[in-house]
Amino acid sequence: MTHIDLLPQDDSTNGWNNMLPPRNPNPPLTDTVSPDWVVVGAGFAGLAAARRLAENRPQDQIILLEAQNLAGAASGRNAGFAIDLPHGQQLQDELSVMPRHIRLARSAIDYLQQQIDTHSIECQWSSRGQYHGAVSAHAFRTEIEPFARVLDQLGEPYRLLDRPQLAAEIGTSYSPGALYAPGAFLMNPAALVRGLGDSQPENVTIYENSPVITANYGGKITLTTPNGRVRAQQLILGTGIYTEEFGFYKRSLLPIALSA
């Protein structure tokens, strides 16, 4: 039996969540249930897995366990944008693989757009694009201009802005210049996670405030929470950095927290 000792804790600092109206969470698990599938973690990964399972296997029952309230963890407190272009480490890849990155990112954005439209999810979803600003003239030459050349090779639209142009558009003259790409979307991620959770198919049952405290991977998957138990044939973990607690990827995951 695997004991899960490190559990998510809500520090009540999620501004995205705090600006939303109060929501009545789903009740915690207080019984023994035996679904076909159990999904742990109601972030983007767990919510997407539960939804697709339910759509592809409408005869199956799916339980989704969330340790906190919906949108309390990482998926509900990110920077609030969905990017369609290669960025960061992806820019070190071969040019030939970048169209694949773009297709994957845009298919994910299209899927989110479909869910938002279908279920009338109010999350301030908007097509605003993204500004890639430089902190210095040197950074503009070494980061922004090479990025622009990559986009030229990919045939992707963009605009380069100098300091006055950037100040006129976004109100700051801090950066000497920036690159604007039109394909990114902005949203309130906590509202998006709430909406994706509250619009799950009928054969998905979400239990909030139901952290898994033990896991047994015998003939059947058996998970216990403080007040209940799940026995299931199949298990999907959408647990992010907590996956090590479930006995997987030991000494392979490095938690990182960013703020701006």
Describe the role of every protein-language-model region.
Residues 228-260:
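Central helical "cap/lid" subdomain
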Residues 41-47, 67:
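Glycine-rich Rossmann-fold phosphate-binding loop(s) that bind the pyrophosphate
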Residues 1-37, 55-61, 87:
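Extreme N-terminal leader/targeting segments of oxidoreductases
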Residues 54-77:
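Glycine-rich FAD pyrophosphate-binding loop
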